[in-house]
Amino acid sequence: MFEDNNQKRPLYIPYAGPALLETPLLNKGCAFTSEERSSFNLEGLLPQNIETIEEQAERAYRQFMAFGNDLDKHIYLRNIQDTNETLFYRLLHNHLTEMLPVIYTPTVGKACEEFSNIYRRARGLFISYPDKDRIDDMLQNATKQNVKVIVVTDGERILGLGDQGIGGMGIPIGKLSLYTACGGISPAYCLPVVLDVGTNNQQLLSDPFYMGWRNPRISGEEYAEFVDAFIQAVKRRWPDILLQFEDFAQNNAMPLLNRYKNELCCFNDDIQGTAAVTLGSLIAACKASGAKLSEKRVAFLGAGSAGCGIAEQIVAQMKAEGLTDAQARGRVFMVDRFGLITDKIPNQLDFQRRLSQPVGRIADWPVGDNISLLEVMEHGRPDILIGVSGQPGLFTEEVVKTMHKHCTRPIIFPLSNPTSRVEATPADLIRWTDGQALVATGSPFAPVEYKGKRYVIAQCNNSFIFPGIGLGVIASGATRVTDAMLMSASRALAECSPLVKGAEGSLLPDLADIHQVSRYIAKMVAKTAMLQGKAVQTPDEVIDQAIEANFWRPEYRRYRRTSF
């Protein structure tokens, strides 16, 4: 729990020569000192000049800027990550706002689609169904022994791009990069995993260069048993792991979370992380206008696991503000491709049924059976509109202007990723509401100029939440991720909103402040874990010390030679 993070202490290294240069966690390149070059048999293997990490980072940045498109920049950064991780994170530290969209959304989506074509070097674990009886051995093969955070995907629902098979590995790699860059979690503790259960993407199956298991996806009992075999093996190998489920399809995401959330320390970022950052943003938006969330009405376009996860967090916050469960749910309207979800619609999933509107509550609406989003705008009169549909352009001018008729300051969050899937662009939303809409998006957008005013578009990015949650779990030794811990993360994020502190501020903090935001979220998460008995009670100052002790910095340490 209270690990020494004094990076001035030397590391004792058993590797030497080319083996040391080929170890990304330890390689310093031309920053090895003369003493280290002699001690580790590196003389003659490196150019003569000894550089600082800042000199290396400046050269790397110049090379980065020479590439003409973001996918090539992504490939370049991944190459640095696979050769010198400390330099990679120093480069991100120096240019985080610029590079975050390159290492993660939206560029990571294209990298996943092209995974087999741009593959350079293995990172993480590829666990394929044909090898299901050897999962324990595979975990022993991991190059990192003291793993504390795993991000795992099966590649079936990658962003808004669907089934990418083994190419989904780009998401765990990218997410864990953010755990380190934003939350200070050492890369030595992070392990990306893809469960290769086949793919139903015919384009991939027909591609001669596809690197995954060439088979249709397994499902049902076969799938459940395979995932369980993986989970049980992880528990044997790393009993105190924090495991994040990532980009699982709707029919698997919620069942897996419900099955394992009380068995190990785990959460689903698409459901819970997205919900937490969205709720934090909404709380901040309401505070800035002097209102409570419980006074608002909320419409969703998209009623999958992510949308319903956000809705449940909103309901929980409304109840915390004094509403009954029925009152809170009556203020939430879930719309899918068939229209508003009501309690008379058959074949609903369990998590949708809890959010369906009773037909009696909308009996006075002059509408037919399939109630459109536009009709919800007209008769439900929501103040907040959230898009998690994965379908572009569905927040039409008519829908938005209808909302604006009854809502002076509409809050509109088109959250679908990547940018090509967004429900409406910020420029359109601001224009259609004459600059009155408060907008946050799932992917990054440039500021919008409208009538002489500049509107900064907040990115409702999970990177404001999950790194802090991870840091809080590791620092406190929490054994579970609970709903209350996620709620604490949301409220902590809202407290960090510049808009709450000043009318002209941004809805979410600047990425330049992400380390302090993550530290604060980590502290609130840790305190809640302790209050719930999920971590050992310690005073505030000890929590602060634990967070700092676990906050890794991209700096080279001195090396001393030792033997195996």
Curated annotation (Swiss-Prot):
<keyword id="KW-0520">NAD</keyword>
<dbReference type="InterPro" id="IPR001891">
    <property type="entry name" value="Malic_OxRdtase"/>
</dbReference>
<dbReference type="InterPro" id="IPR023667">
    <property type="entry name" value="NAD_malic_enz_proteobac"/>
</dbReference>
<dbReference type="InterPro" id="IPR046346">
    <property type="entry name" value="Aminoacid_DH-like_N_sf"/>
</dbReference>
<comment type="subunit">
    <text>Homotetramer.</text>
</comment>
<dbReference type="GO" id="GO:0046872">
    <property type="term" value="F:metal ion binding"/>
</dbReference>
<dbReference type="GO" id="GO:0008948">
    <property type="term" value="F:oxaloacetate decarboxylase activity"/>
</dbReference>
<feature type="binding site">
    <location>
        <position position="157"/>
    </location>
    <ligand>
        <name>NAD(+)</name>
    </ligand>
</feature>
<dbReference type="GO" id="GO:0051287">
    <property type="term" value="F:NAD binding"/>
</dbReference>
<comment type="similarity">
    <text>Belongs to the malic enzymes family.</text>
</comment>
<dbReference type="GO" id="GO:0004471">
    <property type="term" value="F:malate dehydrogenase (decarboxylating) (NAD+) activity"/>
</dbReference>
<dbReference type="InterPro" id="IPR012301">
    <property type="entry name" value="Malic_N_dom"/>
</dbReference>
<dbReference type="InterPro" id="IPR037062">
    <property type="entry name" value="Malic_N_dom_sf"/>
</dbReference>
<keyword id="KW-0479">Metal-binding</keyword>
<feature type="binding site">
    <location>
        <position position="246"/>
    </location>
    <ligand>
        <name>a divalent metal cation</name>
    </ligand>
</feature>
<feature type="active site" description="Proton acceptor">
    <location>
        <position position="175"/>
    </location>
</feature>
<dbReference type="GO" id="GO:0006108">
    <property type="term" value="P:malate metabolic process"/>
</dbReference>
<feature type="site" description="Important for activity">
    <location>
        <position position="270"/>
    </location>
</feature>
<dbReference type="Pfam" id="PF00390">
    <property type="entry name" value="malic"/>
</dbReference>
<dbReference type="InterPro" id="IPR015884">
    <property type="entry name" value="Malic_enzyme_CS"/>
</dbReference>
<dbReference type="InterPro" id="IPR012302">
    <property type="entry name" value="Malic_NAD-bd"/>
</dbReference>
<protein>
    <recommendedName>
        <fullName>NAD-dependent malic enzyme</fullName>
        <ecNumber>1.1.1.38</ecNumber>
    </recommendedName>
</protein>
<feature type="binding site">
    <location>
        <position position="270"/>
    </location>
    <ligand>
        <name>NAD(+)</name>
    </ligand>
</feature>
<feature type="binding site">
    <location>
        <position position="417"/>
    </location>
    <ligand>
        <name>NAD(+)</name>
    </ligand>
</feature>
<dbReference type="InterPro" id="IPR036291">
    <property type="entry name" value="NAD(P)-bd_dom_sf"/>
</dbReference>
<keyword id="KW-0560">Oxidoreductase</keyword>
<dbReference type="GO" id="GO:0005829">
    <property type="term" value="C:cytosol"/>
</dbReference>
<feature type="binding site">
    <location>
        <position position="247"/>
    </location>
    <ligand>
        <name>a divalent metal cation</name>
    </ligand>
</feature>
<dbReference type="Pfam" id="PF03949">
    <property type="entry name" value="Malic_M"/>
</dbReference>
<feature type="active site" description="Proton donor">
    <location>
        <position position="104"/>
    </location>
</feature>
<feature type="binding site">
    <location>
        <position position="270"/>
    </location>
    <ligand>
        <name>a divalent metal cation</name>
    </ligand>
</feature>
